[in-house]
Regions:
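Active-site neighborhood for divalent-cation/phosphate handling
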Residues: 75-175, 289, 319-323
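Glycine-rich phosphate-binding loop plus the immediately following alpha-helix
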Residues: 36-43, 142-170, 203-245
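Glycine-rich phosphate-binding loops at beta-strand->alpha-helix junctions
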Residues: 285-315
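Non-catalytic, solvent-exposed interaction/assembly segments
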Residues: 1-103, 145-147, 155-157
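Glycine-rich phosphate-binding/hydrolytic loop that grips phosphoryl groups
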Residues: 297, 315-352
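Adenine-nucleotide phosphate-binding core of ATP-dependent small-molecule kinases
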Residues: 224, 235-288, 296
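Gly/Thr-rich phosphate-binding beta-strand-loop-beta motif of the actin/hexokinase/Hsp70
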Residues: 1-33, 70-77, 175-206, 210-216, ...
Length: 352
């Protein structure tokens, strides 16, 4: 049994899964709020002690003893790591490692500690002879040590440390067939940021962190309606994007003038820019569908607005769809477990 543990800014999520002859079977899934219940969420006030308490409470809530797991797999957020697909000359392995370390330093925010890298040769480059494509993942020792210290504070024995964007894509690849042509886009909407992932068969893997998350959805609604954070959160969960619509005559008059940009407009514009950048860099722009994951993915009306504004099919992704054992797991928001499931699957890939 593999334990995928996703330690988010607002929720910690866990998925336990077993490897079977045909794939994986989900055993359990659960989540726990990191801040205090019924308190205004302030991401700046969340520290190690909150995460430690939330992880321990989550295990207690699920009646789970982490020592029973064959392996613990956790992830580092995309904003704290760099994931790049590099095209380089073929070279001996020791030279390639030096080249990748040099490359990593250009892409990760250095904090005075050394870079930690992992890379995999993906194959020959389709366009340039004598060149290879290499998948590079990097973070700093400071980031990695901070993550491992947190796990130890939770009483856990650190195992495999993955990066969340790759965990997302592993969960998707397990649940869906990747088309031979075209690109899949995933948007994981976290509390304070979102992670965009673009990939396809034989195509360049791309990820970008966007500085907008579910917390900003709630905050904007709270300010616009002049209501408390918790009330705004409940209203958003119930009514979705329609909750932001003006309901007074004065607001209606203001709408005749310059339309006010919303947090959703900003998020979609960030997505548009990222997809344009990908198309410009790769020459590929056949985006088949956008899949929304994460805690705020199911916000009513969001997938429809993304589809209308970007003119690309959009849907909320359910990582447990048609998965063995899913019917026996009681959860209310499947999409928020995408990363945790992907982490568990990584355990089966490496430890199975």
């Amino acid at each position: 049994m593999y334990l995928g543990l996703d330690i988010g800014r607002q929720y910690v999520k866990m998925v336990t899964a077993e490897k079977t002859k045909t794939g994986y079977k989900v055993i359990d899934a659960g989540c726990r709020l990191v801040p205090e219940q019924n308190a205004t969420y302030d991401p700046e006030k969340i520290d190690h002690s909150h995460w430690v308490m939330a992880v321990k409470e989550l295990f207690r809530q699920q009646g789970f003893n982490p020592r029973k797991a064959k392996g613990l797999i956790t992830g580092i957020n995309g904003s704290s790591a760099s994931i790049k697909q590099i095209t380089t000359m073929e070279m001996p392995s020791d030279e390639l490692e030096s080249a990748m370390t040099f490359e990593a330093r250009k892409h990760i925010p250095m904090d005075g500690t050394d870079a930690v890298i992992d890379y995999q040769i993906l194959g020959s480059n389709k366009k340039e002879v004598d060149k290879i494509d290499v998948g590079l993942v990097a973070c700093t020792k400071g980031v990695l040590n901070n993550h491992i210290d947190l796990l130890k504070e939770c009483g856990l024995k650190p195992g495999i440390v993955d990066v969340n964007p790759i965990a997302m894509s592993n969960a998707f690849s397990f649940a869906k067939d990747i088309p031979d042509d075209g690109l899949v886009v995933m948007l994981d909407i976290g509390a304070v940021s979102s992670t965009l992932v673009v990939y396809g068969k034989g195509e360049q893997f791309f990820t970008r962190d966007l500085p907008i998350g579910g917390h900003h959805f709630v905050k904007e609604l709270s300010e616009k309606k002049e209501i408390g954070y918790i009330e705004a959160q409940d209203l958003l969960f119930k009514d979705g994007l329609s909750a932001s619509k003006s309901d007074s005559a004065s607001d209606s008059m203001n709408e005749v003038g310059i339309a006010e940009r919303t947090v959703y407009d900003n998020l979609i514009e960030d997505m548009r820019r990222s997809l344009r950048f990908y198309a410009k860099q790769t020459g590929q722009s056949f985006f088949l569908k956008i899949f929304l994951t994460g805690g705020a993915a199911g916000t009513p009306g969001l997938s429809e607005v993304v589809k209308d504004k970007l003119n690309i099919e959009c849907a909320v992704f359910d990582p447990f769809d048609s998965m063995d054992g899913a019917d026996d797991v009681s959860i209310s928001n499947p999409s928020q477990y995408t990363t945790a499931l992907g982490l568990g699957i990584r355990g089966g890939m490496d430890l199975g």
